[in-house]
C-alpha cells in the first residue's frame, strides 16, 4: 500500500454469509463486474448509529430482496476482519475516505425459497445474477484482495454451516 493511504481509516462494514438448508452459500455477481470474476456475499457499510444485526438485515434486504423473517442469525464473527483496497481503487471508492473495510460477519440460515431472492429489490441493484455455492469455493470467486477475509470467514463458520 502506498504510504499516502496508510493513515486512512477502515470503513465499518457488515458481511452476510447466507446459507441454505443444503449448506450452500449465496453469492452474487457484482453488477459492475465486466469480466465475470467478482462474485461476493452480501456486504455493506454500517450507517452511523446503526447496530450490527439491523445493518446486516438491511444490507441483505437491499442486495438480495430477502426479508428478515426468512432468515435466522446463527453466529457472529468473533473479531473484525480487515482488508485493504488496491492503491488504484482507494481514490475511486467511498470518496477516497477509506483505505479498505473492517468487517464483522454474520452467518444467517435462509428459510425461504429461491423465488424469495430478488436482485431488483433495491435501485441500483448490487448484483446481476446469483447462485448457491459450496463454502470452500468462496475464496476462489472473490476478487483477490478479499480472499484472505473469505478464507477466514469460511474457516470460522465451517462447523456451523
UniProtKB/Swiss-Prot annotation:
Pfam families: NUDIX. One of its GO terms (molecular function) is guanosine-3',5'-bis(diphosphate) 3'-diphosphatase activity. Residues 9-155 form the Nudix hydrolase domain. InterPro entries: Nudix_hydrolase (IPR020476), NUDIX_hydrolase-like_dom_sf (IPR015797), NUDIX_hydrolase_CS (IPR020084), NUDIX_hydrolase_dom (IPR000086), RppH (IPR022927). One of its GO terms (biological process) is ribose phosphate metabolic process. Gene3D superfamilies: Nucleoside Triphosphate Pyrophosphohydrolase. It comes from the Bacteria. Its EC number is 3.6.1.-. Keywords: Hydrolase. It is an enzyme of class 3 (hydrolase). Its cofactor is a divalent metal cation. A motif (Nudix box) lies at residues 44-65. Belongs to the Nudix hydrolase family. RppH subfamily. Accelerates the degradation of transcripts by removing pyrophosphate from the 5'-end of triphosphorylated RNA, leading to a more labile monophosphorylated state that can stimulate subsequent ribonuclease cleavage. This is RNA pyrophosphohydrolase. It comes from Novosphingobium aromaticivorans (strain ATCC 700278 / DSM 12444 / CCUG 56034 / CIP 105152 / NBRC 16084 / F199). The lineage of its organism: Bacteria, Pseudomonadati, Pseudomonadota, Alphaproteobacteria, Sphingomonadales. The gene is rppH.
Amino acid at each position: 500500500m502506498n504510504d499516502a493511504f496508510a493513515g486512512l481509516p477502515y470503513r465499518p462494514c457488515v458481511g452476510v454469509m447466507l446459507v441454505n438448508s443444503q449448506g450452500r452459500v449465496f453469492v452474487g455477481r457484482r453488477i459492475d463486474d465486466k469480466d465475470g470474476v467478482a462474485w461476493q456475499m452480501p456486504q455493506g457499510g454500517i450507517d452511523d448509529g446503526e447496530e450490527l444485526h439491523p445493518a446486516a438485515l438491511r444490507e441483505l434486504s437491499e442486495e438480495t430482496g430477502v426479508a428478515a423473517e426468512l432468515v435466522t442469525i446463527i453466529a457472529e464473527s468473533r473479531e473484525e476482519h480487515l482488508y485493504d483496497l488496491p492503491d488504484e481503487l482507494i481514490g475511486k471508492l467511498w470518496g477516497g475516505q477509506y483505505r479498505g473495510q473492517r468487517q464483522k460477519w454474520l452467518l444467517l440460515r435462509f428459510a425461504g425459497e429461491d423465488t424469495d431472492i430478488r436482485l431488483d429489490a433495491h435501485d441500483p441493484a448490487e448484483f446481476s445474477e446469483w447462485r448457491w455455492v459450496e463454502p470452500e469455493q468462496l475464496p476462489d470467486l472473490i476478487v483477490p484482495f478479499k480472499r484472505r477475509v473469505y478464507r477466514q470467514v469460511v474457516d470460522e463458520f465451517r462447523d456451523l454451516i
